[in-house]
């Protein structure tokens, strides 16, 4: 069975803190613990799944490997991978008492494992995420060996029945008063032995390979979105189904725009004269420049909304807006004539601050009252 994403298992986001991960695990462990659900196989499976996810995501090294490579990064059967702890008291006592009372629950030949899921972290520009595109991705993976067609045996030969377990994949061992059933150490639970391994894959049935995929990225994706490509993960063992490929999207910061859901935000500088007298300015959008009418006496920080100039949702197809915040820019590098004109203008305002600068007048009146109250 395909493994679910560990963050999805615990019901937390990819940016969850260790405390949030522990809290989520505790809640699931209380809900699905075998002692609370005797005989419930589904609850037992959910408990083990949550335990495995918790052990990976609370280990710094394992979490880093999982975030980069998905389940393949923590697969103990791959070089450099980390193994998630999957054993618990249920495994031990299930084997012991299962054999005493008539056959262990895990008896029989081990099934060939489905291929591991892969994750590819894809970084996009804002323009690419908003408009969509097709990306060529080069994916390192395990592919079915083309020399032995995934059997692991040398061409012209086939696997033979294991003489240790006689094809059962399990052996019984005495431990004190108990008989314990364990995977066969000779064939590793497969029930078959490859005497003449393939010269290319050395008996594994799979080889390391890189493949190139053309992946269509839909318009409107955002950081945190995930695209699933069924069957594009690692090849399964000895003919088992392949895993899936998950493309994890992240969007780079933009020099002009900030995205919040389907809306875009930007700051647009305007001159003092334009803010005071009004007029038209050019505003950037992802589709090009548009004109924006600025009313006279516009204050810095005022927000203008351009409807339909945001992002089209990848799910609902609703289109967001562009919100432009105008910021008045103080002129610099003035020449003598310009400075003189500003002084003349300032002089015309003397004694009329309430009329021309009501906010400033109100502010200084408040400051004056504050100190009067302080000294009274």
From Swiss-Prot:
Q: Briefly, what is this protein's role?
A: Participates actively in the response to hyperosmotic and heat shock by preventing the aggregation of stress-denatured proteins and by disaggregating proteins, also in an autonomous, DnaK-independent fashion. Unfolded proteins bind initially to DnaJ; upon interaction with the DnaJ-bound protein, DnaK hydrolyzes its bound ATP, resulting in the formation of a stable complex. GrpE releases ADP from DnaK; ATP binding to DnaK triggers the release of the substrate protein, thus completing the reaction cycle.
Which PANTHER family does the UniProt entry name for this protein?
Answer: CHAPERONE PROTEIN DNAJ, DNAJ HOMOLOG 1, MITOCHONDRIAL-RELATED
GO molecular function annotations of the record? ATP binding; heat shock protein binding; unfolded protein binding; zinc ion binding
Protein's gene: dnaJ
Q: Which residues form the J domain?
A: 5-70
Specify the residue ranges making up the CR-type zinc fingers. Answer: 132-210
The record's annotation in Pfam families points to: DnaJ (PF00226), DnaJ_C (PF01556), DnaJ_CXXCXGXG (PF00684)
The cellular component terms of Gene Ontology attached to this UniProt record, alphabetical and capped at eight, are:
cytoplasm
Which residues are involved in binding Zn(2+) 2? Answer: 162, 165, 184, 187
How does this chain assemble? Homodimer.
Matches recorded under InterPro entries = DnaJ (IPR012724), DnaJ_C (IPR002939), DnaJ_domain (IPR001623), DnaJ_domain_CS (IPR018253), HSP40/DnaJ_pept-bd (IPR008971), HSP_DnaJ_Cys-rich_dom (IPR001305), HSP_DnaJ_Cys-rich_dom_sf (IPR036410), J_dom_sf (IPR036869)
Q: Which residues form a coiled coil?
A: none
Q: Signal sequence: where? A: none
Top-level taxon of the source organism = Bacteria
Q: Which SUPFAM superfamilies match?
A: Chaperone J-domain, DnaJ/Hsp40 cysteine-rich domain, HSP40/DnaJ peptide-binding domain
Task: Tell me the protein family, please.
Answer: Belongs to the DnaJ family.
Q: What is known of its domains?
A: The J domain is necessary and sufficient to stimulate DnaK ATPase activity. Zinc center 1 plays an important role in the autonomous, DnaK-independent chaperone activity of DnaJ. Zinc center 2 is essential for interaction with DnaK and for DnaJ activity.
Q: Where in the cell is it found?
A: Cytoplasm
Tell me the cofactors it needs: Zn(2+)
| UniProt KW keywords | Chaperone, Cytoplasm, DNA replication, Metal-binding, Repeat, Stress response, Zinc, Zinc-finger
Q: Cross-referenced Gene3D superfamilies, in alphabetical order?
A: DnaJ domain, Heat shock protein DnaJ, cysteine-rich domain, Urease metallochaperone UreE, N-terminal domain
Which parts of the sequence bind Zn(2+) 1? 145, 148, 198, 201
Q: In its UniProt entry, what is this protein called?
A: Chaperone protein DnaJ
Textual note on the cofactor:
Binds 2 Zn(2+) ions per monomer.
Q: Which terms under GO biological process does the entry name?
A: chaperone cofactor-dependent protein refolding; DNA replication; protein refolding; response to heat
Species source reads Shewanella putrefaciens (strain CN-32 / ATCC BAA-453)
Question: In the UniProt record, does the keyword Repeat occur?
Answer: yes
